[in-house]
């Protein structure tokens, strides 16, 4: 029998998802004597290959094979597969084998497919079709019989390995939907996992010895007992087992399957606690009860943790695949971009506004917060169950909370704490759209400290002292409020952080009876969870609603992910100015009510987009968010909206396919740094091959309003020429890829592959092999799951959809509806590609001669011309200045840069910014040496920004490991060949680039350290942090070697030698420069770093040291001095 492919990473991935993973031959052999005859002498090679490559995966909770298993074949293969597909469809199970099949109903008519009574195929399934006609599978059926093959297809998951390192799924639940056991346990704190406790610490920062082995798969090392300060955190995510009597009064919680996923009580008090000695039954996962993006009504959020009664039908060997994830997050995105006018008042629909300040209202509030009842804004209160005594006793306190809310003067607090920072404290008139008035309005944002003062005043007015228990608990919560509003756009605040150092025993309202001398552990954990529910509701509902009611919160174009807080009265005026400017700048036609209705009736699948604005330094940038404004709630067109999204993705995939097949369509367009590197490297090597390097003339130009100025007729003509080709029938295959990286992280991605009938790979084995051959780095150690395949996408249907997309996109602005008469809709995946195709056609027709002996690059709407001919440079500049109306191309002279003199009046009186002939020329984040053509990275964009805000770091669980992984991932992105290639750049330039990369990493290192949770400090485990710095140096040098194959960097005494000690010296120097500015925090690191650097100095040659000191000259890194952190 052929040797089975090894594919160790795929096998490891499958073992983390399934209870058992066996080769097919082994699985069948374990079932009895007849199974040992699966492979026999003389079997065809294709059958032997199938048996060798097939893996049988048994899911957790799967029933065993039938006891009376027969190895006799009764049915044909096609009949058997059809019966299995029908059973899967009837049970409503998602199974790869049944993708593309559905039960017949009124909407899906037609005769059933063969051997079924009520199933039809609405999309091809290449896996199922190839299985039905495969001779190897027919032979397998004859060997194993109907019973076993039905069991394998219905209850197991089959995978076929595809050398060298991948596999594809044949049947079973899609792998991307199966929760990993290892991932589940990572969400449960160490103290409550079924492991034997030995040394270590809570944040898993590890020792120096652990760091060396961290690149390998971790063994299941037992975890340490938590420190005193973290005991409460651990009990939040544990479950207790109260007695049977307690169960009557303290109902357990379960997750309601309703739309808001609230936590509701069940009559059972049984819960689960993991035992080190046995494999436990595991309850289903608790849901994250944060808003899940429904920020428009934060009052609907409720409880935060739940308990489940395990199913009596679950196997004793069931894994923790659905173990509780009692660590929800409240996210800053919940209070972003709030709607409404300029009214500064609490939303009338807010929960506390709808409850009367009485014991009845208090009871309802207690049920919503702690028992998961859904909030009701109208109608009589219904008593569906008796309130447990513990919660009954809480009513007076929550009645006091409702009374405090009713008399709280929110507007007075707002005006007191969030005053306008102007002399006369008046907001400029919104009717004045002059730049000075717009700038003055943009400066009227409230600082986080002012917003915190407002929230603190409201909370102190609202929450009775009895609910806090002590001032200590109140101060802890207020500190978390201040932290919450200081986070960046994508940040989260976890429940563990919210409960850290909160004293549960001080909250007497949590007790169900008078205090005894000792409190059982189960009772203490229950009180802890109840307090967590209240604090989470207070933060995720009340605080978020206050922010959404009184502020418009948004990011800006100049401060990365930092959030700016504008009072509603200020933002309404800013928005009015932005709308007027948008209507003046863009050709929009307002639709009448009849036209809007006609649009809804005719173009059911087209979305109605919404317009919002992002502040700039001196203006507002309009953002048309197509995915945000689908408006399915208003029109009830969810399925049509999904159809639109799928059609948009299909069109995008087809245009990308044509772009790849015909690269000239994109003209001079580059899609990123890798494209720029490939083209720039070829150009530099060609220029340096000349006898004498000519002087180069540089032109940088930026198109004004590129998306809004493109003529629609011209764009339609260009796209029609692309997809109206002879091979205009496209095949679209949608598939998922699941892979595990070197750090053990599992990643899922969903992709589309376009082909024509001439290059179609019809079967999944061929397709997976083709993917590995075409791009082995992108598809390595992966499992491929086919989702669907469409064989009849015609160019005419795609063009019809494109016409609708361009000419009938409706934007809703300030309650009115407009259709765009010129330009292309922004905010979709197509926008950038369409812009590149339009300007690519312009370049092919107008600028072919300009590129002679030179190079023309364009990143979306930013042009760069490098040419040895001054006449070509001037002609190119003149053409762009005068504009190309046919393509809507007009450049912004204020952003145009050249390195040669331009005669006065040559461009109609205007003059671009002129740099010296020899300089570092800026373009799209790069600095290009105009004489040597070497490349540096431009770090000026980091000036006056916060690295802490730009770096999203969620370090609650395994903070140290997360920090190390984050820093290494960012380093790999920054160490690009464009900066490290020694054929493009000199060794000195590469040294400067490496040093600046390390210096930026030092800033990121500091940003991660100051955000470590639970009071973790560098001094507690300085060896770990020194290991991170050392790992960064080693990783950078490894990348440097990969980017320079064939170059001997270690050659001693050679002019281009660059040993690993040199990289390490640059790394230590960069970190010493940054960490010395925070000497109190990093005192324990500075000494070892200085000692290690001195040791390196003794090893490195004098010439190398001179080179390194030149690269680390502070005069070359002045951009970093303006970084805020």
Swiss-Prot record:
A GO molecular-function descriptor: RNA-directed RNA polymerase activity
EC number of the protein: 2.7.7.49
InterPro entries the UniProt entry points to: DNA/RNA_pol_sf (IPR043502), RT_dom (IPR000477), Telomerase_RBD (IPR021891), Telomerase_RT (IPR003545), TERT_C (IPR049139)
Location of Phosphotyrosine modifications: 697
GO terms under biological process: cellular response to hypoxia; DNA biosynthetic process; DNA strand elongation; establishment of protein localization to telomere; heart development; mitochondrion organization; negative regulation of apoptotic process; negative regulation of cellular senescence
Chain segments carrying region Primer grip sequence: 923-927
Site feature (Required for nucleotide incorporation and primer extension rate) residues: 860
Region (CTE): 929-1125
Cellular compartments per GO CC: chromosome, telomeric region; cytoplasm; cytosol; mitochondrial nucleoid; mitochondrion; nuclear speck; nucleolus; nucleoplasm
Ranges for region Linker: 240-328
Pfam families: RVT_1, Telomerase_RBD, TERT_C
Annotated TM spans: none
Modification comment: Phosphorylation at Tyr-697 under oxidative stress leads to translocation of TERT to the cytoplasm and reduces its antiapoptotic activity. Dephosphorylated by SHP2/PTPN11 leading to nuclear retention. Phosphorylation at the G2/M phase at Ser-447 by DYRK2 promotes ubiquitination by the EDVP complex and degradation.
SUPFAM superfamilies to which the protein is assigned, alphabetical: DNA/RNA polymerases (SSF56672)
EC class: transferase
Induction text: Down-regulated by TGFbeta in fibroblasts. This inhibition is mediated by SMAD3.
Basic and acidic residues composition bias: residue spans: 247-259
Quaternary assembly: Catalytic component of the telomerase holoenzyme complex composed of one molecule of TERT, one molecule of WRAP53/TCAB1, two molecules of H/ACA ribonucleoprotein complex subunits DKC1, NOP10, NHP2 and GAR1, and a telomerase RNA template component (TERC). The telomerase holoenzyme complex is associated with TEP1, SMG6/EST1A and POT1. The molecular chaperone HSP90/P23 complex is required for correct assembly and stabilization of the active telomerase. Interacts directly with HSP90A and PTGES3.
Domain text: The primer grip sequence in the RT domain is required for telomerase activity and for stable association with short telomeric primers.
Family designation: Belongs to the reverse transcriptase family. Telomerase subfamily.
Name of the protein: Telomerase reverse transcriptase
Organism phylogeny: Eukaryota, Metazoa, Chordata, Craniata, Vertebrata
Originating gene: Tert
